[in-house]
């Protein structure tokens, strides 16, 4: 019996070591348990002076009087007219920040949708200087939602909650899906870097690395904790067209790698 237990313990240890060895570099484990995600192997670490420089930027920003030029924003009427005019063609429409509508054949995609008045929890966080090109109730029918990470300027709970097309397919990096699931989205797929989803015979989506990080909550646990959920960019491959939605990223070795891996990007 003792001999059996010894063999059992040894096999468990060997299995755990083997399983950990198979994990990608960006999956960090500690004592056999998942700890966090990290950037692509060989990517630079964040400079220790970043917080200091960001603090100085925020202080200086308070003294800047932001004036939006009169003709800077395309009138909503023009946006809606063009949406109707080109509804049977492929197009890309910029809503704001990282929010785009991309129509490719019969599939209409939205990326990192945010139309909320502020980027933060409840009423907190930076507020808009300009309105979005479209409000939620003015969006065309969306078939596919791509979301890159959980930062408040890329994921809006009010937009998820009030989104009119809950039947849309949602593609997100690992551990990002719960925010959609809680708000009645049914078709949610979490991806690791380099996972590809075939949407139809002409369209595929691949999650690719980005040089960034993830956080949504001050709590040390759950998907909103620092780097507990993965982040990424998306490669949209449609017929002979490639669209790279880089989203939030710094420069690193990932771009040379992806240039070699994905011909024609």
Give residue spans per PLM region.
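Active-site-proximal loop/helix segments of hydrolase catalytic cores
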Residues: 158, 214-265
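Active-site metal-binding loops of divalent metal-dependent hydrolases
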Residues: 113-115, 150, 210-211, 247-249
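Active-site metal-binding motif and surrounding structural segment of the metallo-beta-lactamase
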Residues: 124-172, 187, 260-265
